[in-house]
C-alpha cells in the first residue's frame, strides 16, 4: 500500500480508502457480519481511511459498530460528512456532529466534510465558521 502524509494534520493516510456507502443490510448490500469482514480485510491490506456519511441510512452506526467489534478505531482515519443542506444555523452543526460521534461510537472524527456541497442551499459564512470551530 502506498501512503501519503496529510500536510495539515501529519496523518499518514493510505492512497486507497474504503468507501462504506453501501453498508448496511439493504437488499443486496453487506450486512453487519459482511461489513466486519470487508473492513477487517481492508485494514489487513493497509487501508487506513474509511469514508461514511450521515445521509447514508444506518451507515455510520454500522461502521462505528464494526470498528468497535473489531477493535480497529485507533488504526483508522475516519471521515464522515455533514448534511450541510440540513444546517440552518451553527447549533445544527453541533447537533449533527454530536449525533455522528454517537453513531460512530467514537470520541473524534478525523475528517469532517460537507456533503452535497452543490445542493441549492448556499454555504454561508455561518456554515463555514461553525465548521471551522469544529476543526
PLM-predicted stretches and their roles:
Residues 25-28, 52, 86-88, 120-122:
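A generic structural signal for short coil/turn motifs at secondary-structure boundaries
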Residues 1-76:
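N-terminal binding-site loop/beta-alpha segment at the start of enzyme catalytic domains
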Residues 127-135:
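Single conserved hydrophobic/aromatic residue that forms the stacking wall/gate
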Residues 61, 121-125:
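Active-site-adjacent beta->alpha loops and helix N-cap segments on the catalytic face
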Residues 30-41, 89-103:
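Short, acidic/polar
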Residues 21, 55, 81-85, 114-117:
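Active-site beta-loop-alpha junctions enriched in small/polar residues
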Residues 104-120:
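Active-site groove signature of glycoside hydrolases
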Amino acid at each position: 500500500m502506498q501512503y501519503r502524509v496529510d500536510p495539515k494534520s501529519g496523518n499518514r493516510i493510505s492512497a486507497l480508502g474504503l468507501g462504506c456507502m453501501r453498508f448496511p443490510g439493504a437488499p443486496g448490500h453487506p450486512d453487519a457480519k459482511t461489513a466486519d469482514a470487508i473492513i477487517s480485510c481492508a485494514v489487513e491490506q493497509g487501508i487506513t481511511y474509511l469514508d461514511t456519511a450521515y445521509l447514508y441510512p444506518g451507515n455510520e452506526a454500522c461502521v462505528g459498530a464494526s470498528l468497535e467489534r473489531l477493535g480497529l478505531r485507533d488504526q483508522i482515519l475516519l471521515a464522515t460528512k455533514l448534511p450541510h443542506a440540513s444546517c440552518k444555523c451553527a447549533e445544527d452543526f453541533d447537533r449533527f456532529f454530536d449525533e455522528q460521534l454517537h453513531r460512530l461510537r467514537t470520541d473524534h472524527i478525523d475528517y469532517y466534510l460537507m456533503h452535497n456541497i452543490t445542493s441549492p442551499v448556499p454555504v454561508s459564512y455561518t456554515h463555514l465558521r461553525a465548521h471551522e470551530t469544529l476543526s
